[in-house]
Amino acid sequence: MKHLLTLMEFAPHEVEYLLRVSREFKTRFLAGEIYTPLFPGRVLILYFEKHSTRTRLSLTSAAAQLGIQAVYTTPNELQIARGETVADTMRVISRYAAAVAARVYKHETLEEMARHSAIPVINALSDKHHPLQALADALTLWERAGRLHNVKIAFVGDVSNNVATSLAIIGAKLGWEVRLVGPKQLWNQRLVDELAEDAAKTGARIYFTDSINEVAGVDGVYTDVWVSMGFEKEAEERRRLLKPYQVNQRVMEIAGKKAVFLHCLPAHRGEEVTDDVIDGPQSAVWDQAENRMHTAKAVLAYLLK
């Protein structure tokens, strides 16, 4: 059974295939083409422990375009809130649906779901990984930079979070140079070590740096919120630590005119990014958000084929 828990388990050619299918789906969508639903009568369960805008709506829209009915639920609506096990819950869901997309606090919950599932489990965000976001990031950079490989991207800010991790993974699969720009306290050198094998095969370069000047010459500058869901107690400390890594006009000037600005959203305007950047001519965040839908279609089609 093939799941999408992280992109680590996907070979470089599989990642590239997903992106090419995503681009084809987008081309057909923008042309207004109405095509025969690929999976009529199938059901996708959206099991979400956390709030969501883009992930929930992109998956729901993607499913509808493929002929799949998306059913949204939360733990509080299920017997799991009263003590039913994850294992038993997944055994039941497997009888009703063709796939389940889960947005969870702990990545271990996803792993347990997959162990007891007879259907594909899709990571719709966990504390460690956000593979659906990374696929949309890659599609956006491909569109803007004009190439799928040999892309240079700088992730600025909380380089330890799930979005940065998944960006590094997909970069290793596609032969990118991924510069993780942030304070040394947040570096995860083990991630670089884990990606070394893929990087050696694809020619990728993944590294950490605390110098904001490392954004120079990149194809994209990427940031995310400084206080992710679940880290509210550390809010003030994180803001103090990450303040030097705000993406503002000065940072974009260092990056250069060809660099696009990326953000997975929602943005805390005035914190990790200034209004003039996210609303400026180099911003690609709305294309990036749209691409969540097209890459979700590719993932669903690949896992359900």
UniProtKB/Swiss-Prot annotation:
InterPro entries: Asp/Orn_carbamoyltranf_P-bd, Asp/Orn_carbamoylTrfase, Asp/Orn_carbamoylTrfase_sf, Asp_carbamoyltransf_Asp/Orn-bd, Orn/put_carbamltrans, OTCase_ArgI. Reversibly catalyzes the transfer of the carbamoyl group from carbamoyl phosphate (CP) to the N(epsilon) atom of ornithine (ORN) to produce L-citrulline. Belongs to the aspartate/ornithine carbamoyltransferase superfamily. OTCase family. This is Ornithine carbamoyltransferase. GO terms for biological process: arginine biosynthetic process via ornithine; citrulline biosynthetic process; L-arginine biosynthetic process. It is found in: Cytoplasm. Its EC number is 2.1.3.3. The gene is argF. It is an enzyme of class 2 (transferase). It comes from Pyrobaculum aerophilum (strain ATCC 51768 / DSM 7523 / JCM 9630 / CIP 104966 / NBRC 100827 / IM2). L-ornithine binds at residues 162, 224, 228-229. It comes from the Archaea. It holds the Pfam family OTCace_N. Keywords: Amino-acid biosynthesis, Arginine biosynthesis, Cytoplasm, Transferase. Carbamoyl phosphate binds at residues 52-55, 79, 103, 130-133, 264-265, 292. PROSITE patterns: CARBAMOYLTRANSFERASE. Gene3D superfamilies: Aspartate/ornithine carbamoyltransferase. Pathway: Amino-acid biosynthesis; L-arginine biosynthesis; L-arginine from L-ornithine and carbamoyl phosphate: step 1/3.
